[in-house]
């Protein structure tokens, strides 16, 4: 039996949150509360039922809120580059890390254990750091993001095309679920902020007071520009009425609510961008090789218990369907039950020793129990746990014990259609891998599925079979069981979302999430026009010669600054010496007969790396100066072979200049082109250097 702890009188209930006043909204760069006589919705402590706060937005002018974001927010964010915004996010993450203990105490009132709070609070802060870092590494220090290579549209190079991303000119409105009041806000705020789009946050009412506390700290930090962030505490029913094609709505919640919002005329006809991440019947497939006693079986059971109890099962990524080989059901049920009894203590998360708290509200508890009843009516049988109120817990709390149901018929519609959004999962059996794939797909589109197997062929078959039905698939075996971030934990580097029932959208995914808040546009024109618009030099655009560009500091250097070097004649002795010095004696460089038989070479040819090395000697200015180091080489392509007697020359042009906001130097990307004596292109590549700002 699981240990059940009640809320003792000596338990710390965290900081005082007076419910005498309504949780405020933050709009138009000031705090706002409704009139004192407003009828506000009561929000209760998830463990005790005591009133924590009251919430209302009656009287709030949402049209003015949207207009403030489009004007003040757009203007202030538009003054910054991607890197400058990313630096502010990093500072914000550092600031919030210093106040998280206060947030932990408040989070406990939502029913979250300390581990749950870490996932929510630290996880949200982690998104700020990750996206800040990736933006500074993968995006230019400008306001235009280039997508892909230039497309030549004329024979003479005078007309070309390029795809670019620029920020949408409106507002990013996030409508969030109750389960992650911190992470849910920050994981949407971060990419919008880097893109340069102001955000309006509408948290879920049951836990919105925690979101408000985070926003209050964000504002106290003084880090964000004016208009960058607004908060609506309470209803925002007519918010979409004030949006159009310039704006984006990012919704997290139920599929039913998502359908209602998607059907709004401003979405259907007005072009409001709408993304949704909704409920999902995620699965965990136990491979046929993962028998009881294997590391994969143990890891599978541990993952199931974690996902059923973390946040009391109130995660859109929680495991809802256990899909196991025929004949393994009883073994899995026994193992899950044993681990649950040994590891899980249900109670008030402020009490010592508690590992699983209540649901977020009694209303949510009632919905979960109603869903369990529907699962039973659909053919499920409870094989672990009970729908009875757990003994020893506060009757005013929203407690539900973990429940595992078994379905004799794996094709039962209920198990693939009904989600009990709490500590509830169902187990079904499959006959073979094809059957497992079919069952996983019956979820109608899911956020994530785990595949527990150590057999590469089984993993490949299952993943290729289910990938198109999922946003993420986690491979679990003995190698990564300890290092895995877990089935239920989206990471900011990878996409979070899924097709079909899961919402049909994406969040996170590194820089992909930033681009969701931007418009991709194809621009066409001459090289000079493309260079002026993108800030990156395009071949054929104007160049400047004279002073060697290596003698210019970052402040003096401009895209289009160019130097040329050469020619230098290649001899057979040079090729032979390079082969001896490097050990690269590939026959094309050393055996005349074999080289001549190669369809790509006329005979002995120079090593490509010999030519690149010579090119550096031809374009470099060797004396000490602003250029501090060569940091790399990218996009190297060898085009025309070079034979003994040929000559090469190099043209080096400043292509892209990226100042580093926190350093006294920046990165310069140089366009390098090698030609032979016939003006044929021998090689093309980008040279990366670090250059002092002054």
Enumerate the predicted regions with their spans.
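HotDog/MaoC-like acyl-thioester-processing domains
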Residues: 549-564, 642-647, 651-694
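Short, well-ordered beta-strand elements within core beta-sheets of diverse protein domains
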Residues: 39, 51-58, 74-78, 153, ...
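Catalytic strand-loop segment that frames the active site of acyl-thioester-processing enzymes
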Residues: 546-606, 691-693
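Rossmann-like NAD(P) dinucleotide-binding subdomain of oxidoreductase/dehydrogenase enzymes
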Residues: 139-299, 430, 505
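Hydrophobic beta-strand-centered segment that forms part of the acyl-chain substrate-binding groove
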Residues: 597-606, 610-651, 655-656
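N-terminal Rossmann-like NAD(P)+-binding subdomain of aldehyde/semialdehyde dehydrogenases
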Residues: 2-157, 204, 342, 360
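Conserved C-terminal structural/oligomerization subdomain of aldehyde/semialdehyde dehydrogenase
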Residues: 48-54, 87, 223-226, 245-248, ...
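ALDH superfamily catalytic-core signature
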Residues: 217-222, 247-248, 256-410, 432-434, ...
């Amino acid at each position: 039996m699981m240990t059940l702890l009640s809320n003792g009188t000596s338990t710390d209930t965290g900081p005082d949150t007076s419910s005498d006043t309504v949780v405020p909204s933050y709009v138009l760069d000031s705090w706002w509360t409704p009139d004192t006589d407003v009828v506000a919705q009561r929000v209760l402590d998830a463990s005790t039922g005591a009133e924590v706060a009251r919430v209302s937005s009656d009287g709030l002018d949402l049209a003015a809120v949207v207009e403030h974001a489009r004007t003040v927010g757009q203007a202030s964010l538009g003054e910054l580059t991607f890197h400058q915004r990313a630096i502010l996010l990093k500072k914000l993450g550092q600031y919030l890390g210093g106040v998280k203990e206060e947030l932990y105490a408040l989070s406990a009132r939502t029913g979250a254990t300390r581990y749950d709070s870490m996932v929510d609070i630290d996880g949200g802060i982690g998104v700020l750091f990750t996206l800040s870092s990736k933006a500074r590494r993968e995006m230019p220090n400008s306001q235009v993001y280039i997508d892909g290579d230039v497309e030549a549209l004329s024979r003479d190079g005078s007309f070309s095309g390029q795809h670019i991303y620029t920020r949408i000119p409106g507002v990013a409105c996030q409508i969030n679920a109750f389960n992650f009041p911190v992470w849910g806000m920050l994981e949407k705020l971060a990419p919008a902020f880097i893109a340069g789009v102001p955000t309006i946050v509408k948290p879920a009412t049951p836990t919105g007071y925690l979101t408000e506390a985070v926003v209050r700290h964000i504002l106290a930090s003084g880090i964000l520009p004016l208009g960058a962030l607004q908060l609506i505490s309470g209803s925002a029913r007519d918010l979409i009425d004030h949006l159009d094609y310039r704006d984006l709505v990012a919704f997290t919640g139920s599929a039913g609510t998502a359908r209602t919002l998607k059907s709004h005329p401003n979405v259907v006809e007005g072009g409001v961008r709408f993304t949704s991440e909704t409920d999902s019947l995620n699965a965990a497939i136990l491979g046929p090789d993962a028998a009881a006693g294997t590391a994969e079986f143990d890891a599978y059971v541990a993952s199931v218990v974690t996902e059923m109890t973390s946040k009391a099962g109130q995660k859109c990524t929680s495991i809802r369907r256990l899909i196991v080989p025929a004949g393994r059901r009883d073994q899995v049920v026994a193992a899950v039950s044993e681990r649950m009894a040994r590891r899980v203590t249900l109670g008030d998360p402020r009490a010592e020793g508690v590992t699983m708290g209540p649901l977020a509200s009694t209303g949510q508890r009632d919905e979960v129990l109603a869903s369990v009843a529907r699962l039973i009516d659909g053919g499920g049988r409870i094989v672990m746990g009970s729908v009875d109120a757990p003994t020893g817990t506060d009757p005013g709390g929203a407690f539900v014990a973990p429940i595992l149901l078994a379905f004799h018929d794996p094709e039962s519609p209920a198990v693939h259609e009904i989600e009990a959004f709490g500590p509830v999962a169902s187990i079904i059996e499959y006959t073979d891998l094809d059957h497992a794939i079919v069952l996983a797909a019956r979820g109608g589109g899911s956020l994530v599925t785990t595949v527990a197997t150590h057999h590469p062929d089984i993993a490949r078959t299952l993943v290729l079979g289910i990938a198109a039905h999922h946003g993420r698939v986690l491979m679990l075996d003995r190698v990564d069981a300890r290092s895995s971030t877990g089935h239920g934990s989206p990471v900011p580097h990878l996409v979070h979302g899924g097709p079909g029932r899961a919402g049909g959208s994406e969040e996170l995914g590194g820089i992909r999430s930033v681009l969701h808040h931007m418009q991709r546009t194809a621009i066409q024109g001459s090289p000079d026009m493309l260079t002026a618009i993108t800030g990156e030099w395009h071949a054929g655009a104007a160049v400047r010669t004279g002073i060697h560009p290596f003698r210019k500091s970052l402040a003096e250097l401009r895209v289009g600054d160019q130097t040329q070097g050469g020619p230098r004649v290649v001899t057979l002795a040079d090729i032979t010496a390079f082969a001896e010095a490097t050990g690269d004696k590939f026959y094309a460089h050393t055996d005349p007969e074999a080289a001549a038989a190669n369809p790509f070479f006329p005979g002995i040819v120079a090593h490509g790396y010999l030519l690149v090395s010579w090119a550096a000697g031809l374009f470099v200015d060797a004396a000490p100066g602003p250029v501090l180091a060569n940091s790399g080489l990218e996009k190297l392509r060898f085009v025309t072979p070079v034979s003994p007697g040929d000559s090469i020359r190099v043209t080096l042009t400043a292509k892209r200049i990226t100042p580093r906001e926190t350093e006294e130097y920046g990165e310069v990307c140089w366009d390098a082109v090698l030609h032979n004596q016939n003006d044929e292109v021998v090689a093309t590549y980008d040279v990366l250097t670090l250059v002092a700002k002054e």
